[in-house]
């Protein structure tokens, strides 16, 4: 356990940041899973409503990833990799190769 006040304060700050980061990461993962499941649903039953659902879930996930990078929860390269994964999954479903 920390002995001086500054070390105690750093422990409190680290715990506060850990909890905040955990909520960002959790909601980001949830939105990514939602996007992947929307892609699967569109792949099994294509339609305009399913396509709109895929695009909306992609926008929400991108927004959450960008916010996580902005506040320092994720490194910008990690955020770019996550967005790339989502984009390629959506592109694969919406633009099938002929």
UniProtKB/Swiss-Prot annotation:
InterPro entries (alphabetical): Ribosomal_bS20, Ribosomal_bS20_sf
GO molecular function list: small ribosomal subunit rRNA binding; structural constituent of ribosome
Keyword Repeat: no
Keywords per UniProt: Ribonucleoprotein, Ribosomal protein, RNA-binding, rRNA-binding
SUPFAM superfamilies named in the record: Ribosomal protein S20
GO cellular component: cytosol; small ribosomal subunit
GO biological process, alphabetically ordered: translation
Stored Pfam families: Ribosomal_S20p
Record's function text: Binds directly to 16S ribosomal RNA.
Family: Belongs to the bacterial ribosomal protein bS20 family.
PANTHER family given in the database record: 30S RIBOSOMAL PROTEIN S20, SMALL RIBOSOMAL SUBUNIT PROTEIN BS20C
Name assigned to this protein: Small ribosomal subunit protein bS20
Organism: Synechococcus sp. (strain CC9902)
